[in-house]
Amino acid sequence: LNGVLKLLDTLTTKSVTLDPALVSLIKTQAQQFLATLQPVAPAPTTISNTIIPPAPRTLPLTVLFWEGPIARAYLATLKSMGLKPDKIIHLVSKNDLVTQKPIGRFVPRYFKLAYAHSRQKNSIHYWSSTLQKNENTLYRAMRSTIENGLKFPPSVIDDALALVELSEYSPHIETLMIDNLSDNVLHEYLSKLQQTQILFTGGGIVPTKLLEIPTLKFIHIHPGHLPEVRGADCVLWSNLMMGRTSATCFYMAPGIDDGDVILASYLPPLTPRLHIAQRDIKTLYRATYAFFDPWVRGFVLRQALIETDGFTRISATPQVEATSVTYHFMHAQIQHAVFSKLFADI
């Protein structure tokens, strides 16, 4: 269904003549199907943060920091537990994230890094900042759900949104300017690291050459229960197909969300209280990835840290490929169905 709806959009964009009756039939049938769709199976028992947390300390962990809501949620979560990664590798893009053109070609060399970082930070957090100002009711509804449903204190969320200096989270900060994650500068730097675990925070698809560095293990939090909910927009697909938000902490391997699982879990019920009938789908989608998705991941990161004593006692389990399902970016009509079920109308 997702593919058919996307195909209709593509054909319309290319000005291909379509039978209006057929288009109407497809959209009507899709709407009826989505209205009656039931989750594949009842979600298993959820986890809760009830185990004694690890003692406050510096962890043998390196954070590969790519500025954004996810990275900020991770660092705020670690800090709230009294934990600090041994090192943060701060990745700064040489190129504008929108135009992909080089940044600061005429800026003096000694200003270039700070300028590039400022541009990157402003670009990535644009929607978070804008929605807090222009869609405050929506922001507050999502924030309240995170605070009450996932038990993140207001101070932790405030810390993530403050965008403070990275030195607040780790004693050692290294900064690299790169074109992208395939940049040889990054590969050469990581290849020289002592044996460690890398907490990945985003920035694109991790190239195989990085995952194959023998001294490193990359840890990722995926917003879906692996291997049943793989791919893109899984914070939405998990709600639609499984009836519950979920996430998985795992060791990365080449492939889409491949690798041994450290912790996979369905989360407590999350239902923001807000009337959304007249709200724009794009706004709801942007708010989901600014305020909801990062803390879904942060919740499972927190539990994984608790259950593995700060990633020092890990027993990872291979994924069962027979149960794997890969999802793709969700069409707006399906998004509408998900948001209608996710939000509690008031």
Which sequence ranges carry the predicted segments?
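One-carbon transfer enzymes
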Residues: 9, 19-346
